[in-house]
Amino acid sequence: MQISQDEYNKTHKITIKNNQSVGIDLGIKEFISLSNGLQIKAPKPLNKLNRFLVKRARQLSKKQHAKTKQEALQGIKKSNNYIKASMKLNKLHSKISNIRADFLHKLSSLIIRNFNYIGLESLNTQGMMKNHKLAKSLSDVSFYEFNRQIEYKAKYQEKEIYRVDKFYPSSKICSSCGNIKDNLTLKDRVYICNECGLKIDRDYNASLNLLSQLKQHIGLVQSEFTPADLTAMQYDLAINQIATSKVETGIQQKWYL
């Protein structure tokens, strides 16, 4: 489902210019992590519906239909049960697509409304799709579409998007001391710095590094994202039925062996 510019204009007013900035890390466990401590979750119905989708597809394959060109030439036709099952599968595909489109439209609009400068990583999506462990998750959350909507909405409202180089190791750099942890794996959900002892959520750490790169690029004095701003944003997300969580302040701490 595509959102036209006219539809966008009706529901989203031009935002007031400010110097507030944010680093955004796109993840698998959480859809995105923001440098203000908020983490956005993908819609829960998608997980359930995707499992149901697999079940429907298996049921469809068992119904009578021509499975090869040779069978088609032999006159094997689709049974009524196959046609009915196919219609149900298409309906489910549409439902999943609509939920995903609604989520991405609302989320990208809220980010553009709250921030004037946005730091994002330049993901090598094609390369990541080659990893079978990541491919399904990347397909479900539609990173490409999220990036596309952020780009065109930022351009329309004259906000600035800064793309950090795709080879910048945002997840491996300690946001406190700058040490690089080369042995960090996808299984490591908590970043523990071997140099200064910082213990912090992995994705939150990456978002802080992206924010740091953004600030170096724009070179402006930034206004602070206050607790009141954070509360207002959480409320805005809640009324739009977007699930969030806040990074535990206790997890961002230095510890020493």
Regions found by a protein language model. Name each.
Residues 1-147, 220-257:
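Substrate-contacting helices/loops that form the catalytic groove of nucleic-acid
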Residues 137, 141-257:
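Positively charged, low-complexity nucleic-acid-binding target-recognition regions
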